[in-house]
Curated annotation (Swiss-Prot):
It comes from Lactiplantibacillus plantarum (strain ATCC BAA-793 / NCIMB 8826 / WCFS1) (Lactobacillus plantarum). One of its GO terms (cellular component) is cytoplasm. One of its GO terms (biological process) is queuosine biosynthetic process. It catalyses: 7-aminomethyl-7-carbaguanosine(34) in tRNA + S-adenosyl-L-methionine = epoxyqueuosine(34) in tRNA + adenine + L-methionine + 2 H(+). This is S-adenosylmethionine:tRNA ribosyltransferase-isomerase. Its main location: cytoplasm. Keywords: Cytoplasm, Queuosine biosynthesis, S-adenosyl-L-methionine, Transferase. Its EC number is 2.4.99.17. The gene is queA. Belongs to the QueA family. It is found in: Cytoplasm. One of its GO terms (molecular function) is S-adenosylmethionine:tRNA ribosyltransferase-isomerase activity.
Amino acid sequence: MSLTLEDFDYDLPHELIAQTPIKKRDSSRLLELDRQTGEMQDKHFYDIIDQLNPGDAVVMNNSRVMPARLYGVKPETGGHAEVLLLHNTEGDEWETLMKPAKRAKVGTVISFGDGKLTATVTAEKEDGIRMIEFHYDGIFMEILESLGETPLPPYIKEKLDDPDRYQTVYAKENGSAAAPTAGLHWTKELLQKVQDKGIKLVYLTLHVGLGTFRPVEEDNIDDHKMHSEFYRLDEDAAKTLNEVRQNGGRIIATGTTSIRTLETIGSKFDGEIKPDSGWTDIFIKPGYQWKVVDAFITNFHLPKSTLVMLVAAFTGRDMILKAYQHAIDEKYRFFSFGDAMFIH
């Protein structure tokens, strides 16, 4: 029997959607779930170290959120335009979402920051997506840092005092339109402790696209088409993960983006881990056969989202909905700035 969208719905009291990050990253709460027994324990994120064994590997996504939202003016008409950068296709060409899209025809020019940066629409695609080419003097990322703002998820209504709180402490590779949020709980000190305990820290890159927030519209979830995202796992990382595996250690993923990268590679190479890069549209849902990941850290996800489906593929649907109900009863904080789960 195929599952429907309603099977992944749950009632979340509005006040449990975290609007701001907690003061200390690793003081967020942690719901530990044993997927074999269904047993749950309420902890704090800094307790995660007790769950990790020497010889395990913790995998993290080092993608950095770009200040991808730009506000500009069309010199021809004086009309305003909002441009959200999705990803860099080549050179100075970008795939973007534009508002208002219907007025952004091919050839339209938009100026940002008094002309420090201009863009020309080069192609129109479906879903309001526009290809644009930028023109500027200097270094693009520096100009973007000065003119752009970080796009926060639509359910966060409050302004962020410190934009760094929507970046992981190890964010390095520019390219995401949203943060890989499970990683927001790690601090440099906690990662050092993890390393000191004999656990390997492994970094990969997956640039999170806006499809992350796109609702599933098909009742039959098998009909849902995932968005594509760019990923990369380098040679050193693959080598470390293979050594950990050979020595009986666990591969513990931080967040759904790390999971999707590792499972994409495992699916491509018959369960093996090899260095690889490319685009993935993997849709992990109940019935999926896991290839690489042994345990993972993840936040609490939106009702009916593909991310809830991914977690349900690991635990079973009933178990995850029960865990979410427990989290609601215990007043855990949900979504991007919320608390975390450790599922093993």
